Amino acid sequence: MMNAFIQERDLFPASLPFHSGRLQRDLHDLYFEECGSQTGRPVLFLHGGPGAGIAPSHRRFFNPDRFRCVLFDQRGCGQSRPFASIESNTTDLLIGDIEALRQHLGID
C-alpha cells in the first residue's frame, strides 16, 4: 500500500531481498529481510500498524545503490508469529528486537 502523498513514479525501482530470515525473540518469531547494497549504509524501515507488515513496495523507498535496507515484521504483524498476538508486545520489547536484529545482522 502506497502513502497517499508518494507517487509510484517517485520511488526507486523494485528489488528483491538479498537475504531474509527469522529471529526468535521469547515467544515471538520475527521475519526480516535485507535489500539494496550489502555494503551500503544501513537503514531500518519500521512499518505501520496495527497488524500491518512489510510489503514489497517498502523496498522502493530507499536508493538500492546506496543503502542496506533492513525491513522486519514487528511482533504480531505480517509474517512474524504468532500473528496478531499482543502477549509480550510492548514498545520496550520492540526496541530490544531492533537491537537484537542489529546484532544478528552484524551491523555496527
Question: How would you label these PLM feature ranges?
Answer:
Residues 24-82:
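Conserved HGGG/HGGXW glycine-rich cap/lid loop of the alpha/beta-hydrolase fold
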Residues 8-29:
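N-terminal cap/lid segment of alpha/beta-hydrolase-fold proteins
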Residues 7, 32-33, 96:
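Intrinsic disorder/low-complexity signal
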Residues 9, 36, 84-87:
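Residues at structural and domain junctions
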Residues 77-108:
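Active-site loop/oxyanion-hole signature of alpha/beta-hydrolase fold enzymes
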